[in-house]
């Protein structure tokens, strides 16, 4: 793992508003804090604009050469630019639908999410 033997994690926030400075990255910061409180060492937190290609590019850069958890937040709704699932599918090699289903159970609004999970490498 690493010198602290804590599992490693990275966080990607997908939001046009955060990129353009019209919104605070509340969900990304909350996710970093949640992972840290649950024993993960968060080594990277990035922000990208919405769009499948931008998400795929960011996720690939974060995943390649990294053995750990990469989590994204944002862009999983039904608006035209909410394309995080499409970008994620372009990067992962095998889907893990049970993980996405379990995450949706944690929030009453989870059923409105199109989030996906999988592995790369």
Identify the residue ranges that each predicted region occupies.
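Non-catalytic beta/alpha edge segments that cap or flank active sites
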Residues: 1-121
């Amino acid at each position: 793992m690493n010198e602290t033997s804590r599992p490693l994690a990275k966080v990607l926030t997908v939001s046009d508003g955060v990129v353009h400075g019209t919104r605070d990255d509340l969900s990304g910061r909350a996710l970093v804090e949640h992972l840290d409180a649950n024993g993960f060492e968060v080594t990277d937190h990035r922000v990208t604009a919405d769009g499948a290609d931008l998400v795929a590019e960011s996720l690939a850069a974060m995943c390649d050469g990294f053995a750990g958890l990469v989590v994204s937040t944002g862009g999983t709704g039904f608006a035209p630019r909410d394309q995080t699932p499409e970008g994620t599918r372009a990067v992962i090699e095998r889907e893990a639908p049970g993980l996405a289903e379990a995450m949706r159970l944690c929030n009453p609004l989870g059923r409105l999410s199109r989030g996906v999970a999988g592995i790369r490498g």
